[in-house]
Every structure is written in C-alpha cells, then in structure tokens.
Amino acid sequence: MEKYVCIHGHFYQPPRENPWLEEVEMEDSAYPYHDWNDKITQECYKQNAASRILGPNKKIIDIVNNYTKMSFDFGPTLLSWLEKHAPDIYASVIEADKISRESFSGHGAAIAQAYNHIIMPLANRRDKQTQVLWGIYDFEHRFGRKPEGMWLPETAVDLETLEVLAENQLKFTILAPHQANRYRQVGEKEWKNVDGSELDTTRPYLCALPSGQTISLFFYHSPTATEVANGRLLQNGESFAKKMCDIFTENNCPSQLAHIATDGETFGHHHRYTDMALAYCFHYIEFNNLARITVYGEYLEKFPPAYEVEIRENTSWSCNHGIERWRSNCGCHYGKYPSGAQQWRGPLREAMDWLRDELSGVYEKIMSQYVDNPWALRDRYIKLILDRNSVEDFLSNTVGQNLSYEEKVRILKLLEMQRHSLLMYTSCGWYFDDISGIEAIQIMQYACRAIQLANEVDGIDLESKFKGILERAPTNTREPANGREVYDSLIRPNRTDLNRVGAHFALSSLFTEYPDEIDVFCYSATTEVYDRVDAGIQILATGRATIRSNIVLEEHPIDFAVLHFGDHNLTGSVNARMADDAFANLRESLKRAFTKGDTTEVMRLMNVSFGGNNYSLWHLFKDEQRRILYELLETVWREIETSFRHVYEHNYMIMEMMRSMNIPLPKALSTPAEFILNQDLCQTIQNEQVNTGELRRLVDQARRLSLQLDEETLRFVSSKKINHLMAKLEKSPDDINLLESLDSFFSILFSIISNVDLQTSQNVFFMIGKKTYMEMKQRADSGKAPAKKWLELFNKLANYLGVAIH
C-alpha cells in the first residue's frame, strides 16, 4: 500500500480596510505593530516562508519554505494586502506554488478560496457565482494557472454551492467528516450511513450533483486536526509526524491519504513558533520514508475516487448546529460574554439580506441602461479590482467607448456598491460574540458604504430601514444597547466624502509639505493654489485643490482655509469651489485679519464663507491624526523628559543607596527613572553606530535600581536594529569590525531581554554561512590570522542566533 500525507492550511484574515480609504488603519491592540494584519504576518506568514528545522542541539540546521510542502489556500483579500504591504512574503507564497509543481507531478500546492469568505449556503445563487468567479480569477491573476480546487469558507456547504464549483471546472473541495451523510462504493446500490461509524478519511469521494455534474470531496481527519488546532500536537514535530502516520488504516486499498485541514494561522500565530513543528513534521516523514508528501490535486490524479458520497447540506466545520452561527442564537460563541447571547445575529442577517435585495434593484435598474447583462458585468469587475489603472480599458471593453465623465462615475459607483454588498457578508461579522465587536462593525461599514453609493447614484434612502432592522439586534453591553446604536455611534461617523478627504488634505498640509499632486489613500489631491502665512506659533493656510477618487474617478474641486492656533487646536473650512474673484477676496481678507492677530475674525470669515463646513483634528483619518497629535505633543514630551531626567539625575545616588538597603523605590522616583532609562536604551539601540559602552552602562543602572524594562518595545527596536546590522554584514561578510560590534551588542542585549524576533537575521546569517564559512575555514586552516578571528566571531554569533555551523 502506498502511503501519502497532506497537510492543508487555510490562511485567512478578516478584511480590515476602512471601506472609504481602502487601507487598514492603525489598531492599538496590535502594538507594537501597526495593525493585526502586520502582526500576524510577522508571527505566521513570514515564519512559514522561512521556517527553521532544528537539530539535536536545538540549533538551526536548515531553513525551509513550508508553503512548498503543504497544501494551502490564501484569502484573496489577504493576498491583496500582502502584495502591497509585505511584498517579500507575498512573493514567497507565489514562488512556493511554482516550486511545489516540480515536486507534485505538475500540481501546485495552492488552491483557490471563495472571494471574501462568505457563508456560501446563505448566499443567493448570483452571489455564489460571483464569489467563485472572483476567487478563480484572483487565483489565476496571482499564481498564473487555473486552480484545481477551492476552499469553502468555514467549509460551509450545500448542493448549490457544489454545483457552482463544478460549473466553473473546479475539481474538489475539502470538508469535515461530519459533513458526510452516507457513502458507498462506486457501482454498488447500498448506501452506508456515516452515523455510528467513522468515515474513512484516507480516500477521496465522488459527489454526484442534481445537475448531473460531479465533484470530488476530501474529508479531513478530524481528531488529528483538532489536536493540531488546540496546539497539543505542535509541541514536537516528530510527534506530529507520527500522529499523521497513525491516521493510516489497515485496509486493502492500493493507497491511502492521511490528511488534515486547519487554520493556517495555527502555525505561528495561534501557537507561536509552531511553524517549526510543521517544518520538522515534513522533514521527519521524508527523512524516515514514512510516507510521501503530496497535495490534493496530485493525489486525485493518481487515485480517482472509488467511492461516492452524499453530503449533509447546510453544515460547516465550526458550528455544531450547521450554519446557524451566522444567522441565529445557536449557542456557539467565543466566550467573551459568558452570560450573554447572540440574538443579534438574526436581525443582522435580516438587515444585510434586505439591503442586498434593495441594492440589487438599484443596480439592475440603472446598469441595464448601459449593458444587457448587469450581473455578468459584476462578475468581470474583479479584473478592474485587481488593476485599478486599467479603468478606461475595462469600461471601453465591457460597457462602451463613448461614455461621458458622469456616466463613467455612475457605472463605477454601481459596481463599487455591488462590491461592498458582497464584502458586507464576510463571515466574521457573525462569528464572534457581539454586534459591537470589530468584525461586526467592519461588515456594517461595508453596508454603510454601499448605502451611501446607492444614494449618490439613485437618490434612494436605504439607511433608515436598515437601521430600523438593526434596532432589533440587542448587544451584550449596556451601551450601545442595540445594532442601531452601534451603527449611529461607531459606523456612521466614519462615513467619508470628497469634502472630508479635502479637509484631511488641507489640515495635514499644515504639518507636511505636499507636492502639487499627492495620493491620499485611494484618492488624489491636485493643488492649484496654496498660500501659507506663519505668525509665531500660529499658521494660516488657504488654497484651492481638486480631490479625485481613484476608485470611481469622481472629482471635487474645493477651496479651503485652515488655521492652527499653535497647540492641539486647529480648524479648517472646506467647500466646493467658489468664484475666482470671491476666493481671491476671501484670501486677502483672511490674510489681513490673521496678520493683525484677529483670529476671531479669521474664524468668522471661514465660517461664513464656507457655509459652516468646518473640520478639526477629529476629522483627520486615524494614522495621520495620530502622527499630527504626536507632533503637536512633541513640546510636551520634551518638557516631561526634561522634568523626569532632572528627577532621575538629581536623585540617582539616593535611589542607589535605597536599593542597596533593599528599600523599594517610591513611585515618584521609580517612574521617572524607568521612563528615562527605557528611552535612553531605545535611543542607544537605534543610533546608527551602537555605543556598546553606553548600552552596558544603562543596563547596569537598570539592574542596580531594579527598574522595570519595557521589554516589548525593546524587543521591537532590537529586532529592527539586528536586521539592519545583519544586512550590512550580508554586503560585507568579511568585515571583522562589524562582527565584533554584533558580538558586543548581542552579549549585552540578550542579558536583559529574550524572545527577540531573529527570523530575518537568522535567514541572512544562515545564507552567509553557506556562502562564506568553508572559504574562511580553509583560510584559517592555512594559517591566515584574520580568517581565524573571523571564525571565532562567526561561531559566537551562531550561538547567539541559534544557528548550527556545518
């Protein structure tokens, strides 16, 4: 019997982009990273692209790309983010699929995923079709080939979903064993119920569909997958490998496939560093010839299904009640509110379904004026989503060449309205414990954007009825009390138009010198007039610009005036462009009042002239708001630092005496001391030339005073510094002075903090060793003193970095 092993990772993160900006904004809970995508990329996606295999002494003996060995799917919305924000990791994923084809008889490791992770059985046929087509096209665009299989979000399945997969030439999908209803050998009449007997997961099954089509199904081994998901199996790669091989059964089949499927984030994010267990699992199986590593496409070609199966419709892998987790108070929850309930799920689903149907009516009514089949146009819209620069070609090829500016904007708004009507069904919105959670807020933001676009193209008010349905969705919190209050307090204030983008541009121009043309998230600003007047700490700027949406092409010419009072108070007025002479007169009046120091008159003129369209620091988008706020507080920071440094330096001796007498430091002394020492440590580490003497002095002071170090921040800045130094070493691997600096730096650093992210530096060091070590050893063996010194230092660095030298 031939034995095969396949481990599938479902890699996905909920889309977190602000629907009006198309960017993920800063998420404080992900500190020290910018956002959760960034954090999980560092902990998981990056780790699996260069995973370590450890030898008996727990040192790195090899670095491998796990994606070349495992079967995997990546969410299209996640890949879009990775392509832009982590291009090296993105490239590793794409390259892994190419490499895997050489190992798996031409079959790639990657399979597709339904576009934005909706619960397919709860979608109408039209949305199912678009989800599958967008998932396929996104896959082809990125991986350069057609997908053989597709991952169904939450493995939620019904026959109609399988029909859509089969219609689009997809050969297989992966399900949990409890989603099988009954099976039989092909050609037999008798069915065997899965109830009461475990389904044999080591073989593929053929599922006959009502239309006459068929699709192959793989049912993963659930007990092993569960042990992997909860982390127990990932503490040791050898145990993991043996457990995978325990899946094989004693039967007369010519081959068996031991396979599991789990969230890809299990390997590194849910359980830190467990990517190494996965890497060692593959290594152990292959090294000991326990089985052959494969992917589903290869196995299916070699061993077509000899059994057929019927599924349990409306089931999933993550809800004991089928698919009720995404539409009712079924009892499945995450545990955040132990005495709470999820009665909000039903009204939220109802609100989205009602909105979808209303949006469909608007879309069909207007888009039918331009094309015969509006829904076929929506299916093709993915091509423009993936290449926003091709908008003119897309419109001329799909709609027509003689469109006016207004028609182009209207068509693009309709298509965007439909894109957001799909995004608002992202499954995470219902998965967790409350409608006030960030996942539910995210999908309601998509709904809000779709509502806004519908109003702009048709004048229809869908918001009132939508909020009325949400009002029936109770939260598990006292405030906000229901979905309507969540929407009004947490979603509606984020709604953005071109005027607000103009305000963001105008206000931020006080702190950043912009070129005449600048991108502002998914918009662009073209400045035609800009005047700035400084009077001490106060600033007045007036200007004229055109704000343009790079998504729907809409343009909005604006005039603006912004005033900074010198502290955290700044105000701006923005409105549609006024007559040239009126604007010129206003600028002169504002400038005259400002130079006289009459800010009251400046504000009166702004308010009257711009129709009360006033904006402040609160209207800036989050990242820029935070940056400007910190800039405004720079003087305050300096004053605090000066004060704390005075306390620290003038009381250092008494603090040292108190600690020598085992007297705890009072907060009034320890807080300033910790602030100053942590700041000085970070600054010393970040300096271009690390002064190891100063670093050692600061560490000694922290120890003598028993001060608390900010280890999380120190880890972050240290990792960046080590990566920088290692990049320099990569360019000059024989630089002994640099090796000595690294040795000194490591000896001090690792005496105060642990668990520094060394992955990038280990990768570089490992490659330097492979390229340079033997040459240096030969030189040292021939008596070259510099080479001997190089070997001594390189071996010390290898110990610090945990890399074995071959």
Placement of each model-derived feature along the sequence:
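Beta-rich nucleic-acid/ligand-interaction surfaces
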Residues: E154-T161, A180-R184, E301-P304
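Extended alpha-helical scaffold segments
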Residues: N651-H806
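Acidic, His- and aromatic-enriched active-site or binding-groove loops in soluble protein domains
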Residues: A91-F104, G108-A109, L133, R145, ...
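Extended, Lys/Arg-enriched charged tracts that mediate electrostatic binding to polyanionic substrates
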Residues: N48, V64-N65, F74, L82-A86, ...
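Active-site and substrate-binding clefts of carbohydrate-active enzymes
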Residues: E2-G55, P76-T77, W191-L510, D534-G536, ...
